[in-house]
Amino acid sequence: MSSQMLSPIAQRFEQLKHEKRLALMPFLMAGDPDLATTSEVLLSLQNSGADMVELGMPYSDPLADGPVIQAAAARALAAGTTPGKVLEMLTSLKGQLTIPVILFTYSNPLLNVGMEAFCERAAAAGAAGLVVPDLPLEEAERLSPLAEQQGLDLVLLVAPTTPADRMVRIGQRSRGFTYLVSVTGVTGERAQMETRVEGLVEELKQSSAVPVAVGFGISGADQVRQVRSWGADGAIVGSALVKRMAAAGEGQIAEEAGQFCRELRNAAD
């Protein structure tokens, strides 16, 4: 497949593979503490070595998220953040934000708008992919062609508890990359990641040509290096970044996010 045919996410992974580098993929919650800050942070992460960004759409009942990201979602909702406003903010960054943005949304907001309409709006705003953590594989099989029509990659998740045959199906149906959840349970920092993940990276890479990114529980440079040593293609860092941003002084959030991103970038190379 020529690079013209590849999605923005696939192109980025191809480039990194050629450079023998790990994709650094920070996660942040849109609208925490407000959307103006989110747009500053997105540009700061891009300038600090992020290869792509996962942007959370705040939702009132985030089942897959731990306390840090739940608190960020609550702050964003309290500030009046809505899916429509997130997409408006993203649209306003066109031309400035050139790294792929993957929207992380629960299925309820997506189904409220309608799968097709959501995909159209997300693509029009400049998103490159979607992650819907609570969407069953069977529903994902309905959403995937609608996303693909709009040039969006629907990224599917695999956990250490996923049965082997189902894991193969997910790996083969995921687009852009497969999101490997490194621990069972909700998102959050972990001092020790489950060593079983190393074997899962290998299994996924054997059964599918799609890159594998590890997320949930990566808290710093040491774990980014660990993920790299396992042969994964990307590392997703969420709670640790969100926590750093929440602790930063007013006006310092984008700078603090960029500083943390540079630390992780050094570990990823």
Swiss-Prot record:
Alphabetical GO CC annotations of the entry are: cytosol
- Which major enzyme category is it? lyase
State the UniProt keywords alphabetically: Amino-acid biosynthesis, Aromatic amino acid biosynthesis, Lyase, Tryptophan biosynthesis
Q: In which pathway does it act?
A: Amino-acid biosynthesis; L-tryptophan biosynthesis; L-tryptophan from chorismate: step 5/5
Active-site residues, as the UniProt record annotates them: E54, D65
Q: Which protein family is named in the record?
A: Belongs to the TrpA family.
Known role:
The alpha subunit is responsible for the aldol cleavage of indoleglycerol phosphate to indole and glyceraldehyde 3-phosphate.
**What is the name of the protein in this document?**
Tryptophan synthase alpha chain
Gene (name only): trpA
